[in-house]
A protein has these predicted regions:
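Conserved glycosyltransferase catalytic-site signature
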Residues: 16, 20, 45, 106-111
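Alpha-helical recognition domains of nuclear gene-regulatory proteins
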Residues: 30, 50, 115-116
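Intrinsic disorder
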Residues: 30, 42, 103-107
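Catalytic metal- and UDP-sugar-binding loop of GT-A-like glycosyltransferases, i.e.
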Residues: 34
Length: 193
């Protein structure tokens, strides 16, 4: 049976939850959810590789002071191992489809992630968080493995200098310093962590 045949009417569901379909696909071992307009960066690659080396199932990235959701729809990933957690992931996807039934509004995907995935993710995750590590305090929080690219005056020469960026940039002027508790212990000097 084709995957799409298992979920008739999926095309009528809130479109932003379609991107979570790999949770219920037995052929997927690992996946990363991004917005189409969010270009990958070296910073993101370093964070993903850090997570891949861990034994944690979920990867959450909050790389902007406005990434205030427990799980930002454009910045997370999962390891799905058939023998360990595929049935659980499939049930989560189906619960998210049920959650969005008859609803359609901006942010609904993140509400569904918070209601369905967050209770499990916070037990088994790596979370790279540059500004809100104190808000989502967890033993699984980690500072970003690389410093945010910035010029000598802390301006941002690169437009896409945060994960999930669709063209914006983070500078000291528009975001301020990242909190000290979100910086690597060996790099308290990273003002734009």
């Amino acid at each position: 049976m084709l995957f799409s045949e298992q979920y008739p009417g999926l095309e009528k569901k809130f479109g932003m939850v379609w991107r979570f379909a790999p949770m219920a696909d037995p052929l997927v071992a690992e996946w990363h959810c991004r917005d189409l307009d969010s270009r990958p960066t070296q910073r993101e690659l370093a964070a993903v590789q850090d997570w891949q080396q861990s034994q944690k199932t979920f990867h959450i990235m909050r790389d902007n002071k406005y990434h205030g959701a427990s799980i930002v729809g454009c910045c997370f990933g999962m390891k799905i191992e058939i023998t360990r957690n595929f049935p659980q992931m499939k049930k989560m996807f189906e619960a998210m489809l049920d959650y969005v039934k008859l609803k359609w509004f901006k942010g609904l995907d993140q509400n569904a992630l918070h209601a369905v995935v967050w209770p499990e993710a916070q037990k088994d995750m790596v979370a790279h968080d540059s500004y809100l590590c104190h808000h989502f305090a967890s033993d699984f929080n980690r500072p970003w493995p690389t410093q945010r690219i910035s010029g000598p005056d802390f301006s941002a020469p690169e437009v896409l200098n945060f994960v999930g960026s669709n063209g914006g940039k983070i500078t000291l002027a528009n975001h301020g310093e990242c909190p000290k508790q979100c910086r690597p212990k060996n790099h308290p000097d990273w003002l734009l962590c």
